[in-house]
Amino acid sequence: MTIEPRATADLVDDIGPDVRSCDLQLRQFGRRPEFAGRVTTVRCFQDNALLKSVLSEPGDGGVLVIDGDGSLHTALVGDVIAALGRDNGWSGLIINGAVRDASTLRTLDIGIKALGTNPRKSTKTGAGERDVPVDFGGVTFTPGDVAYSDDDGIVVVTP
């Protein structure tokens, strides 16, 4: 199911004071600055095996929200994992953590927002949780919500 991106500023105006807008100032990395889709979540800390497994599945235009607990010590997503998500139909990634291969990420047709970069690899033990509510930036991202992302920020809506 494809969900068309909408301007987050317009969503804020439409929703009003109860809007769920992420307060973290995430940076744009992927080639697609505007993206939207149903939320799937992963919570992991400096380990990207679980999120790679999720991105190996059909994304159906969804958005994978990855809560890496704000760690910038290792990158959770690099060019290989981002390309996997793109190839499997994910519209975007929202990462409370770091990425690497930033120059290559800018060429991939997928939305990617993250805190920053670090060239260091993550571990790959599979530690983490999937499809659980995750909280960062003053927002709870719940599986099945819809996330809208653009240059102004991220808005989350419960359908």
Curated annotation (Swiss-Prot):
Source domain of life is Bacteria
**What is this enzyme's EC?**
4.1.3.17, 4.1.1.112
Q: Where does a divalent metal cation bind?
A: 101
Gene Ontology molecular-function annotations: 4-hydroxy-4-methyl-2-oxoglutarate aldolase activity; metal ion binding; oxaloacetate decarboxylase activity; ribonuclease inhibitor activity
Assembly with partners or alone: Homotrimer.
Provide the family line.
Belongs to the class II aldolase/RraA-like family.
Report what the protein is called.
Putative 4-hydroxy-4-methyl-2-oxoglutarate aldolase
